[in-house]
Curated annotation (Swiss-Prot):
Enzyme kind, highest EC tier: lyase
Site (Part of a proton relay during catalysis): 42, 105
EC number of this enzyme: 4.3.3.7
Gene for this chain: dapA
Function, in words: Catalyzes the condensation of (S)-aspartate-beta-semialdehyde [(S)-ASA] and pyruvate to 4-hydroxy-tetrahydrodipicolinate (HTPA).
InterPro entries in the cross-refs: Aldolase_TIM (IPR013785), DapA (IPR005263), DapA-like (IPR002220), Schiff_base-form_aldolases_AS (IPR020625), Schiff_base-form_aldolases_CS (IPR020624)
MF terms in GO: 2-dehydro-3-deoxy-phosphogluconate aldolase activity; 4-hydroxy-tetrahydrodipicolinate synthase activity
Presence of keyword Lyase: yes
GO biological process: diaminopimelate biosynthetic process; lysine biosynthetic process via diaminopimelate
SMART domains linked to this entry: DHDPS
Family designation: Belongs to the DapA family.
Reaction(s) the record says it catalyses: L-aspartate 4-semialdehyde + pyruvate = (2S,4S)-4-hydroxy-2,3,4,5-tetrahydrodipicolinate + H2O + H(+)
Record's protein name: 4-hydroxy-tetrahydrodipicolinate synthase
Subcellular location field: Cytoplasm
Length: 289
C-alpha cells in the first residue's frame, strides 16, 4: 500500500445512510487522485451503524468505486467472531482488503492479539491492514507482535499506525518490511521519512488533491515541496481533532456543501466556538467559496 487513503465519513440524511451523498463523495476523492478509500472505520461512525448498515455501506462503496481505486473496509471489532464475519462478508462483496482495529475495551494480551488477528488471517484471503490506535483502544500492538504477525501470515501486509510514538514506528520499520501508513495526518511526513508509504487521512476528505501532492512529493524524496503543503494544511490537521473525530470533518464538509449530514448520538454537533475556528481555517485555505 502506498499513497493517500481517506478514511471516509458515512453521510446521513433523516437518520439514514445517504447513499447518493456517499457516491458523490467517492467520485470527488477518486477524481482527485487518492490511492484508495477506507469506509466504515472510526471516521465512518462504525460504532453507531447497525450490522446491516455496516455491511450495506461496504457493498455500496465497492459498487460505486467500481474498481477505480482500492477499497479497504473497516471490519474490526473487539469480538473476534464478529470481526471475522464482517471480514468474510467484505471479501465476498469484492473489497481489496480489510482494516482491523485492535480490540478495544476488553484489552487482550499480546498473545491474545496474535490469536485474534491470526484467526481472521487464516479465514480470509484478501490483504489485512492492522490498525493500531492506543488513544482509542487503551492497548498498543507492540513492535514484536507486529513483526510476528507480518512474518507468520502472508496476507497481513500493512499497518495503519496511529501511535504518535515515532520510536515505535522506527522499531517496526527496522524489524520487518510491513507497509506502514500514518494514522495521523500531521505525522505523515515524519513517518514517510522513516520509511512509511503514505497515510490514512481525515483531512483528505476535503483536501484530497493537496494531500496526494504532499505524499507524492515525500515518496519521491522531495521533502522541501512536501513540507510547503504540510505547513499549509497543518492548521486544518490540528482542528480535525479539536473535538472527537469525525465531528470536525463532518462539520467542515457541511460548511463546504459536501454530503455529510448529521452525526449519530452519542456524538453531537460541534461547539459554536470551535465552529468559528474551523470556518476561519477553511477560509484561510480558500476552501470556502
Amino acid at each position: 500500500m502506498q499513497g493517500v487513503y481517506p478514511a471516509i465519513i458515512t453521510p446521513f440524511k433523516d437518520g439514514k445512510v445517504d447513499y447518493d451523498g456517499l457516491q458523490s463523495n467517492l467520485d470527488f476523492l477518486i477524481e482527485n487522485g487518492v490511492s484508495g478509500v477506507i469506509p466504515v472505520g472510526t471516521t465512518g461512525e462504525s460504532p453507531t451503524l447497525t450490522p446491516l448498515e455496516h455491511e450495506q455501506v461496504i457493498e455500496k462503496v465497492v459498487e460505486f468505486v467500481d474498481g477505480r481505486v482500492e477499497v479497504i473496509a473497516g471490519t474490526g471489532s473487539n469480538s473476534t467472531s464478529e470481526a471475522l464475519e464482517f471480514s468474510q462478508y467484505a471479501e465476498d462483496v469484492g473489497v481489496d482488503g480489510v482494516l482491523l482495529i485492535t480490540p478495544y475495551y476488553n484489552k487482550p494480551s499480546q498473545e491474545g492479539l496474535k490469536r485474534h488477528f491470526g484467526e481472521i488471517a487464516n479465514s480470509i484471503n484478501v490483504p489485512i491492514v492492522l490498525y493500531n490506535v492506543p488513544s482509542r483502544t487503551a492497548l498498543n500492538i507492540e513492535p514484536y507482535t507486529i513483526k510476528y504477525l507480518f512474518e507468520e501470515y502472508s496476507n497481513i501486509t500493512a499497518i495503519k499506525e496511529a501511535n504518535p510514538n515515532l520510536s515505535q514506528v522506527s522499531e517496526v520499520l527496522d524489524s520487518c518490511n510491513i507497509d506502514v501508513l500514518s494514522g495521523n495526518d500531521e505525522l505523515t511526513l515524519p513517518i514517510i521519512s522513516l520509511g512509511g508509504k503514505g497515510v490514512v487521512s481525515v483531512v483528505a476528505n476535503i483536501a484530497p488533491k493537496e494531500f496526494v501532492q504532499m505524499v507524492d512529493f515525500a515518496n519521491a524524496g522531495k521533502f522541501d515541496k512536501a513540507k510547503e503543503i504540510h505547513y499549509k494544511l497543518f492548521p486544518l490537521m490540528k482542528l480535525m481533532f479539536i473535538e472527537t473525530n469525525p465531528i470536525p470533518i463532518k462539520t467542515a464538509m457541511n460548511m463546504l456543501g459536501m454530503p455529510s449530514g448529521e452525526l449519530r448520538l452519542p456524538l453531537c454537533e460541534m461547539a459554536e466556538s470551535n465552529k468559528s475556528k474551523l470556518q476561519n481555517a477553511l477560509n484561510n485555505l480558500g476552501l470556502l467559496k
